[in-house]
Amino acid sequence: MAMSRLRDLSLEIGSGELFGLIGPDGAGKTTLFRILTTLLLADSGTASVCGLDVVKDLKEIRRRVGYMPGRFSLYQDLTVEENLNFFATVFNTTIEENYDLVRDIYSQIEPFKHRRAGKLSGGMKQ
């Protein structure tokens, strides 16, 4: 039986506010962030970020909001470029389609794009 971790959650964070989300293991913190960053669909209810609906406006939210998980989900045997292309495909897009959004970062990884992800340092993986 699935548990509803985020039941009856109501949260509003104002512009410029500093906010921290804390709680015990399994409380739903990661699930909440994945929903708010459009990486996971909620089973029910609604969520918005910057006044944008996380389902209807997911492309605009992804343009504005970044999410860096504590663990990295790179495929160690693929190159940096292969990983980027794979994850772009997962999100039904391409690097070329979003190049204006990733140009600065992409130029920084250019020297490493043919390196296997397993050979990157932790900082480079981020």
Identify the residue ranges that each predicted region occupies.
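ABC transporter nucleotide-binding domains
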Residues: M1-Q126
